[in-house]
């Protein structure tokens, strides 16, 4: 995963495939400067690699004697799985950082690339590790079976690009499926919970590894 601002054109097809442009999801807002002094707001995400971040910081706020404190850092770690809100916070100056995948940054480029004050620079790639899955019902034997089906995914999240890759692999277009977007990555209001719901018409959903295990355990009885 990445901490940075702008990538150029990595997800033009993905952005146009959503029901709304990413800029419409983010909405209007003014560009603000990051306040000098005090703790820097850094978003964290549901990702195993962030264990190192929490360990080095000593928790959500930089703890005295922690690795980051000894390096002169003062950080406030805040939830960042709502990437649309992350971009709003970045634009307004609440945080100088964006956290996400390459494809998520491609979506954000529409917003942050529109003003020279918010154009970002990639400063770190944290991990290459996997942890994302598409879980499907029994009638979806191959990815080509997704045609005509309903697929659930978090809007603006890390799985938009993965869904795009799956469709390309199956030689399908976004118009070949019905996409249901959800605000949360996991828990209430997420694709996983919608997929799990009794009587759900969703044929496939995207999930992080713990949710995938939960779904597959349920499906196998």
State the predicted function of each range.
Residues 1-2, 56:
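Composition- and surface-driven signal marking solvent-exposed, interaction-prone regions
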């Amino acid at each position: 995963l990445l901490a940075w601002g702008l990538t150029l054109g990595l997800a033009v097809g993905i952005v146009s495939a959503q029901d709304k442009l990413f800029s419409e999801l983010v909405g209007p807002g003014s560009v603000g400067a990051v306040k000098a002094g005090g703790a820097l707001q850094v978003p964290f995400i549901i990702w195993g690699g962030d264990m190192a971040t929490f360990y080095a910081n000593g928790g959500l706020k930089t703890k005295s004697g922690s690795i980051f404190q000894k390096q002169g850092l003062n950080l406030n770690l805040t939830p960042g799985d709502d990437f649309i809100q992350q971009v709003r916070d970045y634009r307004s100056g609440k945080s100088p950082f964006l956290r996400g995948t390459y494809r998520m940054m491609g979506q954000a480029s529409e917003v942050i690339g529109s003003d020279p004050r918010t154009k970002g620079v990639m400063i770190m790639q944290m991990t290459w590790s996997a942890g994302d899955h598409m879980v499907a019902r029994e009638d979806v034997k191959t990815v080509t079976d997704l045609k005509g089906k309903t697929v659930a995914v978090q809007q603006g999240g890390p799985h938009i690009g993965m869904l795009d890759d799956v469709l390309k692999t199956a030689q399908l277009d976004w118009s070949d499926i019905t996409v249901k977007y959800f605000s949360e990555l996991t828990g209430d209001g997420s694709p996983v919970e919608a997929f799990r719901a009794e009587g759900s018409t969703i044929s496939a959903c995207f999930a992080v590894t713990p949710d995938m295990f939960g779904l597959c355990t349920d499906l196998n009885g």
